[in-house]
Regions:
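Short, polar loop motifs at secondary-structure junctions
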Residues: 78-82
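A short helix->loop->beta-strand "cap" motif at the edges of active sites that frequently abuts
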Residues: 71, 91-92
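A generic, well-ordered mixed alpha/beta core segment in the N-terminal half of proteins
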Residues: 84, 93-95
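Conserved mixed alpha/beta catalytic, RNA-binding, or beta-rich assembly cores of soluble enzyme
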Residues: 1-77, 97-108
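Short, polar/acidic, helix-capping and beta-turn segments at strand->helix junctions
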Residues: 87
Length: 108
């Protein structure tokens, strides 16, 4: 396992974060819910290409955003099969503890 991915996963597991991104010695964290952490990074114009991410839950929408942001790899305790397939299609390694058919939003 890549050292940056390992650090992202360890930080995610130890903290109360919804997202952790790691690239080389750079570590970013977020406690925002849903897609907000990813959308915030896009809106701010942050260069996150080549980072490894550990995210609480990854569905297809989040997977599309990770592709747009240039992720080098994505881990989530829960990931939809569609998200894993999409990330794999873009040659982004995807790892999950549990794969599910769908990710539902808070209202559903």
């Amino acid at each position: 396992m890549n050292q940056a991915m390992k650090k992202a996963k360890e930080t995610f597991a130890q903290g109360n974060y919804t997202c952790v991104w790691c690239r080389d010695n750079e570590l970013l964290t977020s406690k925002e819910a849903g897609l907000r952490p990813l959308l915030t990074r896009i809106r701010e114009g942050k260069d996150l290409s080549g980072f490894y991410a550990a995210d609480k839950i990854v569905g297809r929408a989040a997977a599309f955003l990770y592709v747009k942001l240039g992720a080098a790899g994505v881990y989530a305790p829960v990931m939809s099969r569609g998200a894993k397939e999409l990330l794999t299609e873009y040659n982004i390694p995807a790892e999950a503890d549990e794969l599910t058919e769908n990710i539902r939003n808070r209202q559903n």
